[in-house]
UniProtKB/Swiss-Prot annotation:
NCBIfam families: PRK00278.1-6, PRK00278.2-4. The keyword Magnesium does not apply. SUPFAM superfamilies: Ribulose-phoshate binding barrel. It holds the Pfam family IGPS. One of its GO terms (biological process) is L-tryptophan biosynthetic process. This is Indole-3-glycerol phosphate synthase. Belongs to the TrpC family. It catalyses: 1-(2-carboxyphenylamino)-1-deoxy-D-ribulose 5-phosphate + H(+) = (1S,2R)-1-C-(indol-3-yl)glycerol 3-phosphate + CO2 + H2O. The lineage of its organism: Bacteria, Pseudomonadati, Pseudomonadota, Betaproteobacteria, Burkholderiales. Keywords: Amino-acid biosynthesis, Aromatic amino acid biosynthesis, Decarboxylase, Lyase, Tryptophan biosynthesis.
Length: 261
């Protein structure tokens, strides 16, 4: 595991310990059970069935590698813009320390539209899955680089029991081999190396031959132009998680439409 990832995971464990003090497990279970759910898997499949790219549009203020991406950051407005311009789902960063995200941002974005929402964070404990449901998430991300396989399998099973869809993220073939032991149909290939934060979309293109036909590839990070989209679609990839390109645009939803539709 990288120094950066090590640091993030250590902070996550500190945050979970503190959260358990302020919101005990049983209290969080009550909050989680009160939330309705939206069909994350169905929203992506519906786009495919209609012959369109399925875009998971990200609400992200900043990143460790790029700094602040959007100074005027209003999650509700961004979510509405995405919904109006053809996004299938939202992804909202909830990590505060490294990405300047917030659970409030997820709640605000979800309340502003009818799209299903992925909680984008570094999940290392089942408590975070209850947090995700309590804040209104419909799906969560499991990062293979941050988890051993038995824990990843256990977290997926618990997520599904809570009604959360799962996107498992990999960056290399070793991680892919482990990720394919999960049941989720969605395999995210992160074009950004979490060890170095270097990015190339060739990462996705170079791993496609190892993905079984019953899995849906989600290409993540580094999709910055219409040309990038066309390269992916020519290779048979039709599901995208995009944040930076939209966040840097004056109108995020209009940029989504320009790149994809």
């Amino acid at each position: 595991m990288s120094d950066i990832l090590d640091k993030i995971i250590a902070v996550k464990r500190e945050e979970i310990a503190a959260a358990l003090e302020s919101a005990p497990l049983e209290e969080l279970k009550v909050q989680a059970s009160a939330r309705d759910s939206r069909d994350f898997v169905g929203a992506l499949r519906d786009k495919h069935a209609a012959g369109h790219a399925a875009v998971i549009a990200e609400v992200k203020k900043a990143s460790p590698s790029k700094g602040v991406l959007r100074e005027h950051f209003v999650p509700a407005d961004i979510a509405r813009s995405y919904a109006q311009h053809g996004a299938a789902c939202l992804s909202v960063l909830t990590d505060e320390r490294f990405f300047q995200g917030s659970a409030r941002y997820l709640e605000q974005a979800r309340a502003a539209c009818t799209l299903p929402v992925l909680r984008k964070d570094f999940i290392v404990d089942a408590y975070q899955l209850l947090e995700a449901r309590a804040m209104g998430a419909d799906a969560i991300l499991l990062i293979a680089a941050a988890l051993d396989t038995p824990l990843m399998i256990d977290l997926e099973a618990y997520a599904h029991s809570l009604g959360l869809a799962v996107l498992v993220e990999v960056h290399n073939r070793g991680e892919l081999d482990e990720a394919l032991k999960l049941k989720t149909p969605f395999v995210g290939i992160n074009n950004r190396n979490l060890r170095t934060f270097e990015t190339t979309i060739d990462t996705t293109l170079g791993m496609l031959d190892a993905i079984p036909d019953d899995r849906i590839v989600v290409t993540e990070s580094g999709i910055l132009s219409r040309a990038d989209v066309e390269r992916m679609e020519a290779a048979g990839v039709h599901t995208f998680l995009v944040g930076e390109a939209f966040m840097r645009a004056e109108n995020p939803g209009a940029e989504l439409a320009r790149m994809f539709f």
